[in-house]
């Protein structure tokens, strides 16, 4: 798939822009704080209905306005697909083929993107919530039912936590009813995640082995607050874990076990990647991103769109070459950069946009 055009209105520092893209490589060139990353953010937003930089939709709207529009024409194997997202004071409207979508899970997955940004290094060093977010975003693109199951789980979890906080003495029967719903949706979420990570690990191992010149074996482990030694009896194990945790939950007024507490661990040659070098961390993240591309291709039979936010300067020559090998293949890529110095080995057939103060000054 590839994005033919993008129209943005009242998005960040752009009052309005209408851009036609190259099916291969598109480069946004400009100094910092001019609006390069905002275009990548708009593309990401068009795909996933959310920003990778902020949790607040208000941050995306131009400071002089109270609404925004992001729309694009996506080219897939089945033909052209118009996409629209409109943020207004009354809420969000998403459309596919000009038809309003009632649920986000009906919209997300139409356009697949893989984002690689400098802050992705925090996947290894950051908090567990960042790694859960990574799973949720990537898995949600390729398996819409996951978003539905996760949403239902979070709804019951919020209901349970609110009940615990509001009552010093609880109705054990009512709590058991909530627990059964948590077990149902929680087990679905865990099984989705395990299946996703098993497939991602397979692709990432091959990529990391190649990048490390056959020296490092990468493994990915799902760390669950629910024991996973008998996956066929997961519901029973989950139920028992909630019973064991109930005294703790009543005291702390929240839920101590479940997929909202889970994490991922990365190992290089069986050693915790947390203790690896910065170079190993960059190789690991690059391996994951390249694996995402392969995984999305294998499931959707479409090539995702690659977004590279000022990452070339973060990579050494060998890692740049591995990334460039992917770019040179049949994948639409968007790159932001302050200089073309790091892009000497890119294909000649590219489109360069010069960005200045929220304006596209030139195209070549």
Swiss-Prot record:
GO biological process: DNA replication; DNA synthesis involved in DNA repair; double-strand break repair; SOS response
GO cellular component annotations of the record: cytoplasm
Similarity comment: Belongs to the RecF family.
Role noted for this protein: The RecF protein is involved in DNA metabolism; it is required for DNA replication and normal SOS inducibility. RecF binds preferentially to single-stranded, linear DNA. It also seems to bind ATP.
Annotated protein name in UniProt: DNA replication and repair protein RecF
InterPro entries registered for this protein in UniProt: DNA-binding_RecF, DNA-binding_RecF_CS, P-loop_NTPase, RecF/RecN/SMC_N, RecF_2
Disulfide bonds: none
Organism of this sequence: Streptococcus sanguinis (strain SK36)
Gene: recF
Pfam families referenced in this protein's UniProt entry, alphabetically: SMC_N
The entry's keywords: ATP-binding, Cytoplasm, DNA damage, DNA repair, DNA replication, DNA-binding, Nucleotide-binding, SOS response
Compartments reported by the entry: Cytoplasm
Keyword Ribosomal protein: no
GO molecular function (one): single-stranded DNA binding
Domain of life where this protein originates: Bacteria
PROSITE patterns given in the database record: RECF_1, RECF_2
Residue numbers binding ATP: 30-37
NCBIfam families: recf
The keyword Nuclease appears for this protein: no
């Amino acid at each position: 798939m590839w994005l033919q055009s993008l129209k943005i209105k009242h998005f960040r520092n752009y009052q309005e822009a209408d851009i036609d893209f190259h099916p291969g490589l598109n480069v946004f060139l400009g100094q910092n704080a001019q609006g390069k990353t905002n275009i990548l953010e708009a593309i990401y937003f068009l795909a996933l209905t959310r920003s990778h930089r902020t949790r607040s939709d208000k941050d995306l709207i131009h400071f002089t306005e109270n609404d925004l529009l992001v729309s694009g024409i996506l080219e897939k194997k089945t033909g052209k697909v118009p996409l629209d997202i409109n943020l207004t004071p009354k809420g969000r409207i998403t459309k596919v083929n000009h038809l309003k979508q009632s649920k986000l899970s009906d919209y997300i997955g139409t356009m697949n993107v893989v984002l690689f940004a400098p802050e992705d290094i925090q996947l290894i060093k950051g908090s567990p919530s960042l790694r859960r977010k990574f799973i949720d975003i990537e898995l949600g693109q390729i398996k819409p039912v996951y978003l539905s199951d996760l949403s239902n789980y979070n709804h019951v979890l919020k209901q349970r936590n609110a009940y615990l906080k509001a009552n010093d003495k609880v109705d054990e029967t009512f709590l058991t009813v909530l627990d059964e719903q948590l077990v149902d949706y929680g087990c679905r979420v865990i099984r989705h995640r395990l299946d996703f990570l098993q497939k991602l690990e397979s692709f990432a191992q091959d990529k990391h082995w190649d990048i490390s010149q056959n020296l490092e074996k990468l493994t990915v482990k799902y760390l669950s607050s629910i024991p996973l030694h008998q996956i066929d009896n997961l519901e029973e194990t989950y139920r028992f874990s909630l019973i064991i945790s109930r005294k703790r939950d009543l005291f702390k007024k929240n839920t101590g076990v479940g997929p909202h507490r889970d994490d991922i661990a990365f190992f290089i040659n069986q050693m915790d990647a947390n203790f690896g070098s910065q170079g190993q961390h960059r190789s690991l993240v690059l391996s994951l991103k390249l694996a995402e591309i392969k995984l999305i291709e294998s499931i959707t039979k479409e090539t995702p769109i690659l977004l590279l936010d000022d990452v070339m300067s973060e990579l050494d020559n060998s890692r740049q070459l591995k990334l460039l090998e992917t770019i040179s293949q049949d994948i639409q890529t968007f790159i932001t950069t302050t200089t073309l110095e790091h892009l000497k080995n890119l294909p000649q057939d590219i489109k360069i946009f010069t960005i200045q103060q929220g304006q596209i000054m030139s195209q070549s």
